[in-house]
């Protein structure tokens, strides 16, 4: 994975890029959060949905909840950008809906809207 620091409306955002499904498992998430939070010291993260292995969207894996908790613990914001129409699980749809009401993690289709949300205080 690559992390590029960009500026949007005067605020730094870490954009994560890489191979599809390169975020596999909680260890990869811990590494990513550590890299962004401690090495780059940027609390706002933009990532493509394609980076996340689809199996991790299974709520039974605990990945989604752990990701949200880690982001909250480190006082970060994460926007995951992409198409979430593949989601069939009512529980996951509810998780995404609830996340999108909060100020920690959002799942958005539009990159510009994601960036605009990330830079809000």
Regions found by a protein language model. Name each.
Residues 2-121:
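Amphipathic, Lys/Arg-enriched alpha-helical "gate/interface" segment within cytosolic domains
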